[in-house]
A protein has these predicted regions:
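Metal-dependent peptidase/peptidase-like ectodomains
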Residues: 56, 298-299, 308-414
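C-terminal segment of N-terminal export signals and the immediately downstream linker at the start
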Residues: 24-51
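His/Asp/Glu-rich mid-to-C-terminal helical/loop segments that flank catalytic regions of hydrolases
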Residues: 413-453
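Noncatalytic luminal/extracellular "stalk/propeptide" segments of secretory-pathway proteins
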Residues: 43-47, 51-157, 167-168
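Catalytic-core environment of secreted peptidases
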Residues: 44-47, 55-77, 91-99, 150, ...
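N-terminal secretory signal peptides and thylakoid transit peptides that target proteins
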Residues: 1-17
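Second-shell loop/turn segments in exported
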Residues: 48-55, 71-80, 159-163, 169-170, ...
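Soluble metallo-hydrolase cores and metallopeptidase-like ectodomains found primarily
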Residues: 120-150, 197-277, 292, 296, ...
Length: 453
């Protein structure tokens, strides 16, 4: 088919899609053309923007996030939480009629713990140098920074928490009879809350040693201030683990002789103790909502969604995926839109950053910048600027146009929400529907623009 004829057919197809999505729905049409909160001007949409912008709904995405963050909770690489999330994501994408592939890969053991306090259970890290696969129950004794541990703490759960490094005091507690040790970290910087961790101990001990997040340490100390507290602690070494990438694709509507594809991606795992609402449940549900919206729209390229496992342990899932691609496969990818932390409610993180590894423009950053201009969001965006640390990196290293898109502070890329990587990264405390909607519109419009051309 001649290029001009193909364009006419494509334009007609988009028109039909637009009619189906907004032409018969005055409310949706009005929403597509209204000026957004925080936008500089009313949108000046191109023809392909309408069927995307009129249909994406942050509230639909939120329903997926309630499953991932509230119901499943922490999604640690290779463990039950990540596997449940994998199954949910795959089921949603299959129901949307995508061709779904699960890509397994082996990962290292994970050392996790739990603390049962009354009716609450907190997930923590546990030390590989402590006793594993063990449960201990006892009265908690708070020894502050561990500099003055009583001579006899037999059978007690010794709690050590301070701003300074508290790891060394564990050995004294173990030698004096502690049943288990809880190490808490209290951050000196009020803008950076500290996460649960797996303590590295210079000398192994034969009791469980758990690493608490800052908020867990604070909550435990608050309970202790009211009286005696009894807890049940457990340590588990998760062995022989397999993590998964979830890949979903639909072919181009029209002849695609070069088999070109546009990728929209996010990671679905989280760090220990964190339900990962923003990091990166938000990016994951953005992908699921865009998969719904884009599934029937006419395209000149294939659309591929990829949800990565094991990002939090070194981009393992995306690196594995890229390592399995042939050179022709790599050259077929027009662009990779990575979405990592796209909905924080933290007020100072009001800039939507375009983050390429080298700080240079590429097809993805240009498409998002153009979409921001059309939608009136240009003043809320910055970049591209140089930043790695997410799943766009392996693609960039192979020459694929790729970038990460994320809400962060205006003062710098490191200005993330204080609840980053903590148990406080919840829907209630750290999700903005308005910012999620902006992210959906920007990535949806940008990705569809690449898919159409």
């Amino acid at each position: 088919m001649a290029d001009l004829s193909r364009r006419r057919v494509f334009t007609g197809a988009v028109a039909l899609a637009g009619a189906a999505t907004i032409g018969l729905n005055p409310v949706a049409a009005a929403q597509a053309t209204r000026q957004r909160t925080g936008a500089q001007h009313s949108p000046s949409l191109n023809f392909g923007d309408y069927p995307v912008v009129a249909r994406v709904r942050a509230r639909r995405a939120l329903e997926h996030l309630r499953v991932l963050s509230d119901k499943i909770g922490p999604r640690i690489a290779g463990t039950e939480g990540e596997l449940r999330a994998k199954d949910y994501i795959a089921r949603v994408l299959r129901d949307l009629r995508y061709q779904v592939t699960l890509q397994p890969f082996k990962i290292a053991d994970k050392f996790l713990g739990s603390v049962r306090v009354g009716k609450d259970t907190w997930q923590t890290g546990s030390s590989p140098q402590g006793l594993q696969d063990a449960t201990r129950e006892g009265v908690v004794i708070d020894v502050g920074d561990g500099s003055a541990i009583p001579a006899d703490v037999t059978g007690k759960i010794v709690f050590i928490a301070a701003v300074t490094n508290v790891a060394d005091a564990y050995l004294t507690a173990a030698q004096r009879g502690a049943a288990a040790v809880l190490l808490g970290r209290i951050g000196a910087d009020p803008l950076r809350r500290l996460s649960a961790f797996s303590p590295t101990l210079p000398t192994p001990v034969t009791i469980p040693v758990l690493g608490l997040a800052q908020v867990q340490a604070e909550r435990l100390r608050a309970r202790l201030a009211k009286g005696t507290v009894t807890v049940k602690v457990s340590s588990v070494q998760h062995k022989n683990l397999t993590s998964y990438n979830v890949i979903a694709e639909r072919p181009a509507t029209f002849h695609n002789p070069d088999n070109k594809v546009v990728m929209v991606t996010a990671h679905y795992d989280s760090v220990p103790g964190s339900p990962g609402a923003n990091d990166d449940g938000s990016g994951t549900v953005l992908c699921l909502e865009l998969a719904r919206v884009l599934r029937y729209l006419p395209t000149n390229k294939a659309i591929r969604f990829a949800l990565w496992g094991s990002e939090e342990y070194g981009l393992i899932g995306s690196r594995h995926y890229v390592s399995q691609l042939s050179e022709p496969d790599i050259k077929r990818i027009t662009g990779t839109f990575q979405n990592d932390m796209v909905a924080t409610a933290y007020d100072p993180a009001h800039i939507y950053w375009l983050l390429s590894v080298d700080g240079a423009n590429n097809a993805t950053t240009q498409a998002v910048a153009a979409a921001a201009k059309r939608l009136g969001y240009e003043p809320r965006t910055k970049g591209p600027v140089a930043r790695g640390s997410s799943d766009h990196v392996p693609f960039h290293e192979k020459g694929v146009p790729a970038a990460n898109f994320s809400w962060r502070g205006e003062g710098g890329l490191a200005l993330l929400e204080p609840t980053y990587h903590t148990p406080e990264d919840t829907i209630a405390d750290n999700i903005s529907l308005e910012r999620l909607q902006v992210s959906l519109e920007l990535i949806g419009a940008a990705a569809y623009d690449l898919l159409r051309h």
